[in-house]
């Protein structure tokens, strides 16, 4: 990865920070983006390799901030080889009761922010004739979550975006990888937009680590995969839902009764 430049959004903690660290450990120059510049800088020092890392404030809901961060990156490193769309927020509420303003706020980050970042970085990658865009989605983008309809819908949309963009950008030498983690042990579950935080399943229960997700991201990138589902034990569940959705929904309803 020496000589490669990687940009990671939502990099101040959790999966984003773990991805930034792994790519930096493999020799890449890494730019950590976060809405909070102080948190991004703190993550940069935890990542290490400060001679070839950069921390910048960037709210993916604001195109001008994306363009500014990209401009600084190109000024410092001259290129972008990998752009990781990791910034995201959650929401737990019943579909019939959720506040539409909160739902729109979630989509602004999870979906429209991903599109905005892709549109910003693609011209630079086209100029190089090479590049990889990695979208961090979720297993919830394959199997919808009760009381998590907006989050699941945003991740279904990210999955579809990745598939379409992959076909469109192939002729430009740009690859699009979608990574779908299951439950991850991070602070993400505590950072919900909606007030009903008590409905969320604890992320510490049978979850995987952010570092494991980062390894899956790196391996998927190196092998030029189209999609990675992590942990692999979630793959049968995804396939089962595609074939027998009623059975999976029955099982999920039973599990919800125990929460």
Label every model-predicted segment:
Residues 171-232, 250:
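SDR active-site lid
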Residues 138:
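Residue(s) in the substrate-gating loop at a strand-loop-helix junction
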Residues 37, 57-68, 100:
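The beta1-alpha1 cofactor-binding region of Rossmann-like NAD(H)/NADP(H)-dependent oxidoreductases
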Residues 94-95, 99-104:
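Substrate-binding pocket helix/loop in short-chain dehydrogenase/reductase
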Residues 26-43:
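Conserved glycine-rich Rossmann-like NAD(P)H-binding loop of the short-chain dehydrogenase/reductase
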Residues 118, 154:
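Active-site helix of classical SDR
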Residues 5, 12-13:
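Conserved glycine-rich cofactor-binding loop
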């Amino acid at each position: 990865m020496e000589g490669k430049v990687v940009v990671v959004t939502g990099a101040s903690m959790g999966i984003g920070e773990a991805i930034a660290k792994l790519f930096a450990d493999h020799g890449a120059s890494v730019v950590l983006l976060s809405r909070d510049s102080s948190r991004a800088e703190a993550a940069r020092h935890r990542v290490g390799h400060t001679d070839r890392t950069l921390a910048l404030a960037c709210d993916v809901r604001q195109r001008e901030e994306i363009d500014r961060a990209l401009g600084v990156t190109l000024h410092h490193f001259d290129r972008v080889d990998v752009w990781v769309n990791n910034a995201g927020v959650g929401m737990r509420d019943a579909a019939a009761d959720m506040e539409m303003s909160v739902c729109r706020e979630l989509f602004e980050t999870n979906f429209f922010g991903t599109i905005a970042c892709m549109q910003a970085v693609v011209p630079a990658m086209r100029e190089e004739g090479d590049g990889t865009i990695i979208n961090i989605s979720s297993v919830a983008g394959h199997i919808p979550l009760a009381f998590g309809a907006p989050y699941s819908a945003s991740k279904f949309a990210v999955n579809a975006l990745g598939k379409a963009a992959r076909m469109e950008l192939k002729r430009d030498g740009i690859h699009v990888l979608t990574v779908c983690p299951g439950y991850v042990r991070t602070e993400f579950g505590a950072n919900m937009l909606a007030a009903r935080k008590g409905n969320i399943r604890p992320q510490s229960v049978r979850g995987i680590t952010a570092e494991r997700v980062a390894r899956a991201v790196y391996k998927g990138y190196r092998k030029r995969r189209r999609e990675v589902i992590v942990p692999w034990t979630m793959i049968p569940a995804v396939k089962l839902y595609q074939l027998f959705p009623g059975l999976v929904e029955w099982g999920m309803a039973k599990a919800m009764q125990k929460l």
